[in-house]
């Protein structure tokens, strides 16, 4: 790139993976090994696993069809990515791959494992149509299923713990209906990559519209109240140069030959300006009130500033690691804060002046599990299999916990021995809040998910009214 950083791809010179990329060296000097496997290797591995497990091997062909509807297929798949060299941590490399992939006997992606070895994603495919995904799951979350029509288009998205959707396709419009019987219609124009949604009928009957130019760039948007906003893209770059609001007021935007914003003028006539160096780094920014902020750089191979100076002359300095991580920050008074990071880039310590430090620990999945200060006071954190924070244990041993529903929404929180609970509808909206003393607050929404009524624990009801564009116009 323009800073002299190079990403290098290493290809096998011979053998069954000849010509394939099996290694990458990034601009910071880290080397990653890409572990490839053939269909025959995966089939043999499946047979060996079955034998060691004392089960009957399942059908796993040694070869795949050379051509599919998606194109040529040589059967080679990426199975793992390893970090094999790190200039900053040469003696502390991960003992396991950063990510692993599992494949079906037909060569479809089946599972993804993170650096801790835990499964984080899984996929299921149609028995008849190779590569057609019919189910998908994040670990700890419900499985979402899909159904298709004869043309391979999704007609149903089935969500066992939330909203499900059906899709009906016509020549120039698509009708989407959710399990609450709310309907939206998307009207389209154009073909292939230039197809655009030009009109949307919302569930409440309101309509919004958009217009595009011949190459698919947005030119106008008309809201549900019939008010139109105009956009003027640059003929060559497509960058927006002017926005005119429904009341006729305009904002203008100007760019340099690198497509970087150099100035912007709002409807009120106020302007911001930006200047860049020959490498495209921001070196000066002028605010609408005329205040100037300057940015300094001491490394020609980095786009990160080493210092900033504001309109008052106050100066702040920063140092960075080769991986772009903040190592130290010195404020305008000379107060220095230093930061430590682990090999995964996560912050492990913050050191402030006067010997005050804070230390952070993470589990094998990269989740924060403990924060300890200089005096040894430690706060610990626990998570469920989906990665939701379930407990915070304070230094005195007190425990605050949270329970979640299948989709990761908090349904119960306990703090200081007091419990508060939440109930949701199928759309994921809070409909009932029960406080620590057992009193209730209920909520109602319109078909566009806008809050329209709130009844408090004292029985008093507050109603909210919105205009066609969704703006709150009255409460009573």
Where are these regions (language model features)?
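Extended charged/polar low-complexity repeat regions
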Residues: 1-476
């Amino acid at each position: 790139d323009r800073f002299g950083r190079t990403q290098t791809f290493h290809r096998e010179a011979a053998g069954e993976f000849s010509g394939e990329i099996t290694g990458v060296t990034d601009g910071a000097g880290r080397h990653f090994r890409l572990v490839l496997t053939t269909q025959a290797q995966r089939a043999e591995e499946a047979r060996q696993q079955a034998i060691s497990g004392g089960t009957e091997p399942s059908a796993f062909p040694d070869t795949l069809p050379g051509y599919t509807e998606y194109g040529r297929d040589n059967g080679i798949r990426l199975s793992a990515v390893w970090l094999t060299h790190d200039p900053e941590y040469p003696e502390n490399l991960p003992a396991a791959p950063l990510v692993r992939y599992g494949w079906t006997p037909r060569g479809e992606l089946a599972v993804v494992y993170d650096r801790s070895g835990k499964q984080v994603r899984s996929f299921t495919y149609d028995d008849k149509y190779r590569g057609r995904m019919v189910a998908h799951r994040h670990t700890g979350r419900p499985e979402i299923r899909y159904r298709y029509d004869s043309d391979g288009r999704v007609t149903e998205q089935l969500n066992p713990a939330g909203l499900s959707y059906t899709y009906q396709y016509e020549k120039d419009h698509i009708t989407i209906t959710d399990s609450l019987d709310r309907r939206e219609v998307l009207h389209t124009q154009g073909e292939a990559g230039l197809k655009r949604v030009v009109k949307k009928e919302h569930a409440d009957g309101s309509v919004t519209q958009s217009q595009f130019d011949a190459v698919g760039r947005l030119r106008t948007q008309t809201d549900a109240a019939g008010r139109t906003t105009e956009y003027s893209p640059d003929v060559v770059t497509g960058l927006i140069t002017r926005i005119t609001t429904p009341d006729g007021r305009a904002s203008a935007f100007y760019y340099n030959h690198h497509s970087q914003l150099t100035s912007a003028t709002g409807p009120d006539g106020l302007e911001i300006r930006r200047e860049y160096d020959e490498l495209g780094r921001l070196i000066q920014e002028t605010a609408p009130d005329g205040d100037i902020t300057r940015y300094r750089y001491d490394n020609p191979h980095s786009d990160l500033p080493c210092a900033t100076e504001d309109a008052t002359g106050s100066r702040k300095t920063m140092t960075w690691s080769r991986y772009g991580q903040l190592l130290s920050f010195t404020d305008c008074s000379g107060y220095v804060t230093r930061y430590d990071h682990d090999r995964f880039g996560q912050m492990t310590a913050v050191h402030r002046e006067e010997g005050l430090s804070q230390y952070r620990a993470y589990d094998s999945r990269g989740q924060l599990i403990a924060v300890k200060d200089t005096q040894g006071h430690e706060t610990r954190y626990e998570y469920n299999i989906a990665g939701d924070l379930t407990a915070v244990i304070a230094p005195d041993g007190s425990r605050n916990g949270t329970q979640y529903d299948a989709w990761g929404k908090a349904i119960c929180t306990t703090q200081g021995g007091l419990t508060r609970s939440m109930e949701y509808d199928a759309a994921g909206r809070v409909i009932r809040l029960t406080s620590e003393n057992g009193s209730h607050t209920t909520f109602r929404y319109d078909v566009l998910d806008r809050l329209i009524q709130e009844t408090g624990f004292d029985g008093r009801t507050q109603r909210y009214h919105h205009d066609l564009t969704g703006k709150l116009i009255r409460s009573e």
